Structures are given as structure tokens and as C-alpha cells.
Amino acid sequence: MSASGENGTAKDYISHHLNNLQLDLRTFQLVEPHSGTPTFWTLNIDSLFFSVVLGALFLFIFKKVANTATSGVPGKLQTAVELIMGFVDSSVRDMYHGKSKVIAPLALTVFVWVFLMNMMDLLPIDLLPFIGEHVFGLPALRVVPTADVSITLSMALGVFILILFYSIKMKGVGGFVKELTMQPFNHPLFIPINLILEGVSLLSKPVSLGLRLFGNMYAGELIFILIAGLLPWWSQWLLNVPWAIFHILIITLQAFIFMVLTIVYLSMASEEH
């Protein structure tokens, strides 16, 4: 029997798995699923919890490897960490042409953190929600932080702030304003048009960065939920296994794309005109 058969219709099952565990910051009480449209004061605490835990896991692993690193024959974990660091460092050297000690650590953090959050999509779809409901009494639980648009746009907002910081740092306030108002048409009469064009171009970077990651991971999560909700349990593996194998490529690719675009945007912001 499928999970949908145990918990109601397939529609109910799918809808349940697309609900976040939410906290109303005005009352500090959990929001019941399907109780209405989320507001500005609604916090998706499951997405926040898993993103923080996975970020802490990343820091713990890399800190442990750094403290126990040896110049002799490295272990498997040290080898994996060194390969990741070498790959990220090579990517930064190829794409970032400025001078900054922040970009490489930032790129490493972005790549590994996004990858770990994406990897949560490979867990059995009912495992953690079942534990959350029957052990902790949680009304809902989603375990893939990057399938939550608030998480991906928050990360993109951080990148956007760095874009503004490096743009102003390299060009000064006057140079930054001039870039927004005197390009692409270098004439005072075209300042309003230039401001609209450059403003849209600037704002589209974080929006596209966040929505691209969200869209791909949400779609991947939804496919797993549809397979679990519409098929009997004994036949789910026929689609789950091939999709999971293919999804590993998507998970890695999306983490790489997020890292690359972050580096490219910061490199563009660091260019002097």
C-alpha cells in the first residue's frame, strides 16, 4: 500500500508534503497546514533548521580535516576535501580577476552548503516527516531547504549585497551611480532610461540566481512526491531509482551553477571602469 493510501487521497498526500513547518512570529505559535496564505511574519522553521544544521555540518567536517590534515598519505575524507578545495580554487582563479581573500572561501561555502542542502532531496520522502509527526508531533515537515524560495532568495540577497559592496568599493559611490545612470547611453537626457535598464539588469542577478536554484530543486522534490503519492509502494522503485541517479547530477550541477554565477557576478562588480 502506498503512503497516499494510508493518509488519504494522492492529492492530500502530495499537498501535505509540500507544506512547511511554519511559525507565526506575531504569536510564536506553529501554523496549522492549509490554514491560509503565509504572511511576512511567517517563518519556515524546517527550512531554516536544516539549512543551519547542514551549514554547521560543513564547518565541522572541514574544521576537523584542517586540524587533522597530514602531509603523508591522506585518508578518504581528507582526499575528498582537498579535491573539492582544489576544484573551487581553480574555478575562482579562472573566473575572478580581482584581488580578494574572501571570494575563494565564499565560493567554497556556497558550493558545499548548497550541495548538502540539495542532497536532502535523496532521502526517502516519508522518512523525516514520519519521524517528525510521530516522535515530535509536528504537523508538517519539508527537508529540502533549497526547495524553499525564501531560502534561495535569502542566499541570493547575500550575494546581491556583496555585489553592491564590491561595486562601490572598486568604483566609489560616484562611479557606481555613474555606471547606473550613464550606461548604455552616455548622455544626460537618457539618464532615466539608463537607470531603468541598469536597475533591471542589476536586480535580475539575485532574482534569477535564487529562482533558478529554487525552481530546479522544487521540481525535483515534486517528482519524488508524485511518484510516492501516485504509485503503489512495490512499484515506486521503478521510477525512483532512475530519477534519483539522474537527480544526483542535477544536485551537483545546481550547486556548481550557483557558485559560478556568484563568482562571475562578484568579478563583474570588481572590475574598474
From Swiss-Prot:
<comment type="subunit">
    <text>F-type ATPases have 2 components, CF(1) - the catalytic core - and CF(0) - the membrane proton channel. CF(1) has five subunits: alpha(3), beta(3), gamma(1), delta(1), epsilon(1). CF(0) has three main subunits: a(1), b(2) and c(9-12). The alpha and beta chains form an alternating ring which encloses part of the gamma chain. CF(1) is attached to CF(0) by a central stalk formed by the gamma and epsilon chains, while a peripheral stalk is formed by the delta and b chains.</text>
</comment>
<keyword id="KW-0813">Transport</keyword>
<dbReference type="GO" id="GO:0046933">
    <property type="term" value="F:proton-transporting ATP synthase activity, rotational mechanism"/>
</dbReference>
<keyword id="KW-0472">Membrane</keyword>
<feature type="transmembrane region" description="Helical">
    <location>
        <begin position="102"/>
        <end position="122"/>
    </location>
</feature>
<dbReference type="GO" id="GO:0005886">
    <property type="term" value="C:plasma membrane"/>
</dbReference>
<comment type="similarity">
    <text>Belongs to the ATPase A chain family.</text>
</comment>
<dbReference type="InterPro" id="IPR023011">
    <property type="entry name" value="ATP_synth_F0_asu_AS"/>
</dbReference>
<dbReference type="InterPro" id="IPR045082">
    <property type="entry name" value="ATP_syn_F0_a_bact/chloroplast"/>
</dbReference>
<keyword id="KW-0406">Ion transport</keyword>
<keyword id="KW-0997">Cell inner membrane</keyword>
<keyword id="KW-0066">ATP synthesis</keyword>
<comment type="function">
    <text>Key component of the proton channel; it plays a direct role in the translocation of protons across the membrane.</text>
</comment>
<feature type="transmembrane region" description="Helical">
    <location>
        <begin position="148"/>
        <end position="168"/>
    </location>
</feature>
<keyword id="KW-1133">Transmembrane helix</keyword>
<feature type="transmembrane region" description="Helical">
    <location>
        <begin position="213"/>
        <end position="233"/>
    </location>
</feature>
<keyword id="KW-0375">Hydrogen ion transport</keyword>
<dbReference type="Pfam" id="PF00119">
    <property type="entry name" value="ATP-synt_A"/>
</dbReference>
<keyword id="KW-1003">Cell membrane</keyword>
<dbReference type="GO" id="GO:0042777">
    <property type="term" value="P:proton motive force-driven plasma membrane ATP synthesis"/>
</dbReference>
<keyword id="KW-0138">CF(0)</keyword>
<feature type="transmembrane region" description="Helical">
    <location>
        <begin position="42"/>
        <end position="62"/>
    </location>
</feature>
<dbReference type="InterPro" id="IPR035908">
    <property type="entry name" value="F0_ATP_A_sf"/>
</dbReference>
<protein>
    <recommendedName>
        <fullName>ATP synthase subunit a</fullName>
    </recommendedName>
</protein>
<feature type="transmembrane region" description="Helical">
    <location>
        <begin position="244"/>
        <end position="264"/>
    </location>
</feature>
<dbReference type="InterPro" id="IPR000568">
    <property type="entry name" value="ATP_synth_F0_asu"/>
</dbReference>
<keyword id="KW-0812">Transmembrane</keyword>
<dbReference type="GO" id="GO:0045259">
    <property type="term" value="C:proton-transporting ATP synthase complex"/>
</dbReference>
